[in-house]
Amino acid sequence: LDWCEEIGIEVVTLWLLSTDNLARPKNELDPLLRIIEDTVCDLADKKKWVIHPVGALNMLPEATSQALVKAQETTADVKGLIVNVAVGYGGRREVVDAVKSLLQEHHAAGSSLEELASIIDIEHIADHLYTKGQPDPDLVIRTSGEQRLSGFLLWQSAHSEFYFCEAYWPNFRKVDFLRAIRAFGARNRRYGV
């Protein structure tokens, strides 16, 4: 995160655990959840970054969900890098949750079926994503040598550039980060044009 701050990045999303990962055996999942809770607590205690949980918190164990909410509350007044902490996150789930939220909001307001149909568009759905109000990512760095998105920020990454790195996350070095930034800087972003 310090590396991101050094070059002026304002929003970072760290994907720590997918919704698919929640199906892992308890003996694998529980230690991961404790590491995530400790990591989020450590990030919040620094009071250096704004912690923003991203994911289906209702699918997480209570202790993990509470750790994420507490980190968000602890850093609410911090002025600095926004760190989206994606835990219990799946891109498809996010889009479904956004559409449900949008429909519930307009149903509660008494909107007709025709009115509901007219507001199902890119802008209105984006306003209900977990990352609402944030810019879409310019660059997505995927560690571990895997060359797939695995459902990461499906909606938001429509025009993102991707960089795949062989290093696993714990071994990801500053030189790896700078290579990704350099590769991104050399690209000609066309946004579909």
Language model: regions and residue ranges:
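Flexible, compositionally biased loop and terminal segments
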Residues: 1-193
